[in-house]
Structures are given as C-alpha cells and as structure tokens.
C-alpha cells in the first residue's frame, strides 16, 4: 500500500512549467542584450559608411565641404538625433601647419592638404533595462591627403 501512495504523490506534470519559468527571464535578458548589441554595431557600421562616402567624394575632387558634409549626413542610414559630420582642411609644409595661401620651400611648392572627416553621435539602446540602459558616444574619423 505504501508503494501506491508514493506513486499518487509523485506527479511530474508541473516540472517542465517550473523549469520554463526559471529559464524564460534569462533568455529574455540574453535576447534584449543581443538586440542592443546589434543596434550598436549597425549604427557604428552605418556611420562608418557615411564617412567613407564623404572620403570618396573628397578623393574624387569635391571641394565644397558643406555639400560633402550634407551628403555624408544624408547617406548615414537611421542616424540618431544630434548626429554630426564635420570636415576640416589642414595645410602642411612638412610637419608645420600653414595657411592655404602659403607656399613651401621658399615659394616653389604648394602645401600638402589633409581633409579630416569626423562623424559623432550618441547611440541609445532600443531597450532600456538594467545595466544596458546607458547611452554611448560613437564616432569615426578619417584623414585623407588630397594633395
């Protein structure tokens, strides 16, 4: 008779539900972490692509920095609010920074021209929870020697 009562009280039908209830929160945290990581990586890659677009324009001979900046910002897919692309030109004779109108080597050589393209933005995670709720600054910089 003891054997029969042991089988009655030993019911395993709820074990799977309890295991599922214990595992689901962990799986949700992992899923949200993967989504946040993917969002960060795709934002960074999109930003790098926009800087590359601007760099290609400069290497093809674009001289209007404002237009190049606008093209870079418009090619940045799903850019965050406050995203910025800046272009700066630096004229150098050797290791010395000079004016655009200066000539090097006693007036015989034009200075080297370097164009610095810099993109910055603040990335915010799509899901805000726990330690993953922090926004981060992302940026990419490229320097091109034009002449």
Q: What do the PLM-derived regions correspond to, one by one?
A:
Residues 1-75:
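Alpha-helical assembly-interface signal, strongest on the long, hydrophobic N-terminal helix that forms
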